[in-house]
Amino acid sequence: PVAGFGSRMLPASKSIPKEMLPIVDRPAIEYVVKEAVRAGIKDIILVTHSAKTAIEDYFDTQFELEHQLEAKGKDALLAEVRDTLPADVTVISVRQHRALGLGHAVACAAPVVGNEPFAVLLPDVLVDCGGQQEDLGAMVERYHARGAAQIMVEEVPEARVDQYGIVALKGDVPNPGESAPMTAVVEKPAVEDAPSRLSVV
């Protein structure tokens, strides 16, 4: 989903979609899409709204730009532009016409997803995997091994649980990289009502 307003990133997100804010020399959304591709995902569905066309445009082919770079002999830059999206990956967009939250955004993609397995990626959080296997790749492997849905979480300070979706677990909190059964997600609970300090990433 890329339809949110990015209120935690204002004022920058007032005119630039938060997913397009740069991390070094590339927008955040590119890192997310490339991790999905490395995990074996070839069909990317962006759930967006009318103010986010810059995201759709970013993954579209820019024939005029490519022609100009080629004509000027800027081959290295042309290769980078073309590398934005591998040729065997498809990106499509569906619109979320009303801001009704993450669950609604995911449901907007249901007609396209059908009964196929899918991953929901939130492109506003960066996670350092510490040089190990990327988290999405590990989650895809676990899904195929166990046949059970996976959700990535990160421990947050108690004072900040009211800013995130917080998970309730069945049993103890697992060690990093391990899985545990989950019973619910509570959206932005009051500190005293939070079932844990594990936030959905």
Question: Where are these predicted regions, by residue range?
Answer:
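N-terminal glycine-rich phosphate-binding loop and ensuing alpha1 helix
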Residues: P1-L77, V91, Q96, Q132-A138
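Short, well-ordered turn and helix-capping elements at secondary-structure junctions
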Residues: F5, H97, E154, V186-P189
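A generic structural signal for short coil/turn motifs at secondary-structure boundaries
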Residues: M9-L10, D128-G130, A194-P195
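Short glycine/proline-enriched turns and hinge-like loops at secondary-structure junctions
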Residues: A12-S13, V120, V161-D162, R197-L198
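Structural signal for conserved beta-strand scaffold positions within catalytic alpha/beta enzyme cores
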Residues: P22, S93-R95, I151, A184-E187
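Well-ordered alpha-helical segments embedded in enzymatic catalytic cores
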Residues: A28-Y31, H104-C108, A184
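Conserved beta-loop-beta/alpha segment of the NTase-like Rossmann-fold superfamily
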Residues: D57, E64-Q68, D75-G171, N175
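A short, charged helix-loop
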Residues: K170-V200
